[in-house]
UniProtKB/Swiss-Prot annotation:
Name by which UniProt lists this protein: NADH-quinone oxidoreductase subunit A
Annotated organism of origin: Chromohalobacter salexigens (strain ATCC BAA-138 / DSM 3043 / CIP 106854 / NCIMB 13768 / 1H11)
Originating gene: nuoA
Segments crossing the lipid bilayer: 16-36, 69-89, 94-114
E.C. number(s) listed in UniProt: 7.1.1.-
Protein family (similarity comment): Belongs to the complex I subunit 3 family.
Length: 139
C-alpha cells in the first residue's frame, strides 16, 4: 500500500466503522422484530385505522391540480428565501457585485411572479366571464 492510501485509511477508518455499525444495528433490529414479533391474521387487521375511526370508502381521492401548483410555488419562493438569507448574511463581504446579483435574482423572481399572476396561476377559483348582473333595488 502506498503512503497516500495508508493516510486515507487512517483518516476515515472511524467513518467506515460507523457505517458498518449502522448497517449491522439495522439488520439486528429488523431480524429481532421478525423473530419476536407477533403474527396475527384477521379481517380487522387489514383495515386502516386512524384516530379511532374506521375509514369508509376509497382511500384514493382526486385532488385538484391547484394544490400541486400551490405546493410548487411555495417551494420555489421558499428556495428564494434561502438564497436571499445567505446573501443577507454575507452582504458586507460580497459588496456591490453581490448586491447586483441579488437584485437580478429578485427581478427574475418578481417577473416570474407577475407572469404567474397574469396567467391566473395564483387564482384559486376561475374568473367569471361577462358582466355581473345589475343590482336590483326593492322599493
Amino acid at each position: 500500500m502506498t503512503d497516500e492510501a495508508t493516510a486515507l485509511i487512517a483518516q476515515y477508518w472511524a467513518t467506515g466503522l460507523f457505517i458498518i455499525a449502522v448497517f449491522a444495528l439495522c439488520a439486528l433490529m429488523i431480524g429481532a422484530a421478525s423473530l419476536l414479533g407477533g403474527r396475527s391474521r384477521g379481517p380487522s387487521k387489514s383495515l386502516p385505522f386512524e384516530s379511532g375511526v374506521v375509514g369508509t370508502g376509497s382511500a384514493r381521492q382526486r385532488f385538484s391540480v391547484k394544490f400541486y401548483l400551490v405546493a410548487m410555488l411555495f417551494v420555489i419562493f421558499d428556495i428564494e428565501a434561502v438564497f436571499l438569507f445567505a446573501w443577507a448574511v454575507s452582504v458586507r463581504e460580497v459588496g456591490w457585485e453581490g448586491f447586483a446579483g441579488a437584485a437580478v435574482f429578485i427581478f427574475i423572481l418578481l417577473a416570474g411572479l407577475v407572469y404567474d399572476s397574469r396567467v391566473g396561476a395564483l387564482e384559486w377559483a376561475p374568473r367569471k366571464r361577462g358582466r355581473s348582473p345589475d343590482i336590483v333595488t326593492q322599493r
